[in-house]
């Protein structure tokens, strides 16, 4: 991935990243495909579901760390599968033990198994506890602008509103709420969940999101490695388009050729 100017790096908890594409590590057919897709995406931050993926809990089983070493990647342990604040906090503390004091974590507390929408009450409760416990919390939440701001005020280092339900592939469903969240934020806003294809990722970046996290859109594609590459390019293009500034929408045409001095 092309190195951005230092002023355009993604900064999370004081650390600078070149890539604005964050990827998950679940749903791939094996660890080798996970590695290849992560490399094709040029991701630097990768999420790990502590309750589902081995990062040392079972010393006799293959470990994700064998293919995605912490020396090369920022591992982002997440609380996928947690439905209460207590479960989420306990999972984060386990991750910190397994990763030698690693404090960066992705908090998600789900409301039900059908929608996988966040339980915002439990999310707020867990976020407060984790921040007080010294964690650097990146938090999965709804696209409610008021809630997003509240999570920032609690001390979360990044807010991660959904674009659509997890794994749905529906794309950006409420760009106006995302714009409101972005406009009011002083921490990175990273779209999490709902991306289905490269154009969805580009739209999120064109809106002004600081990054996009995805898993199913890549792992569930017919060719995950190729899709990872497509997503990387979409993120880059969307970011450049945002920085360049799109032209305003108009109802009527506007000639692209100058009209002054037209012959005849």
Curated annotation (Swiss-Prot):
CDD domains, alphabetized: ThiG
Compartments where located: Cytoplasm
Single GO BP term: thiamine diphosphate biosynthetic process
GO molecular function: thiazole synthase activity
Active site: 106
Coiled coil: none
Pathway: Cofactor biosynthesis; thiamine diphosphate biosynthesis
EC number: 2.8.1.10
Keyword S-adenosyl-L-methionine on entry: no
Residues where 1-deoxy-D-xylulose 5-phosphate binds: 167, 193-194, 215-216
Entry GO CC: cytoplasm
Pfam family, one: ThiG
Keywords, sorted A to Z: Cytoplasm, Schiff base, Thiamine biosynthesis, Transferase
UniProt-listed SUPFAM superfamilies: ThiG-like
Oligomeric form and interacting partners: Homotetramer. Forms heterodimers with either ThiH or ThiS.
Membership in a protein family: Belongs to the ThiG family.
HAMAP family named in the record: ThiG (MF_00443)
Protein name per UniProt: Thiazole synthase
Species in which this protein is naturally found: Xanthomonas euvesicatoria pv. vesicatoria (strain 85-10) (Xanthomonas campestris pv. vesicatoria)
Organism taxonomic ancestry: Bacteria, Pseudomonadati, Pseudomonadota, Gammaproteobacteria, Lysobacterales
């Amino acid at each position: 991935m092309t190195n951005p100017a230092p002023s355009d790096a993604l900064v999370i908890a004081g650390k600078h990243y070149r890539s604005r594409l964050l990827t998950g590590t679940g749903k791939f057919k094996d660890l080798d495909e996970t590695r290849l897709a992560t490399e094709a995406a040029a991701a630097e931050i990768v999420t790990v579901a502590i309750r589902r993926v081995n990062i040392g809990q079972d010393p006799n089983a293959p470990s994700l760390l064998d293919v995605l070493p912490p020396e090369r990647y920022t591992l982002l342990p997440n609380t996928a599968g947690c439905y209460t604040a207590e479960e989420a906090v306990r999972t984060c503390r386990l991750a910190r033990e397994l990763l030698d004091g690693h404090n960066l974590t992705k908090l998600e507390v789900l409301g039900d198994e059908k929608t996988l929408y966040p339980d915002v009450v439990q999310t707020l409760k867990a976020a407060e506890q984790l921040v007080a416990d010294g964690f650097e919390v990146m938090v999965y939440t709804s696209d409610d602008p008021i809630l997003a701001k509240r999570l920032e005020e609690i001390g979360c280092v990044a807010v991660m509103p959904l674009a659509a339900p997890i794994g749905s592939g529906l794309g950006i469903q409420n760009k106006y709420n995302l714009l409101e969240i972005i406009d009011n934020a002083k921490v990175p806003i990273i779209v999490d969940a709902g991306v289905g294809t490269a154009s969805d990722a580009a739209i999120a970046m064109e809106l002004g999101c600081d990054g996009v996290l995805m898993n199913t859109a890549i792992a569930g594609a017919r060719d995950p490695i190729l899709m990872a590459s497509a997503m990387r390019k979409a993120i880059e293009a969307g970011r450049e388009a945002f920085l360049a500034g799109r032209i305003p929408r108009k109802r009527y045409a506007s000639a692209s050729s100058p009209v002054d001095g037209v012959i005849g």
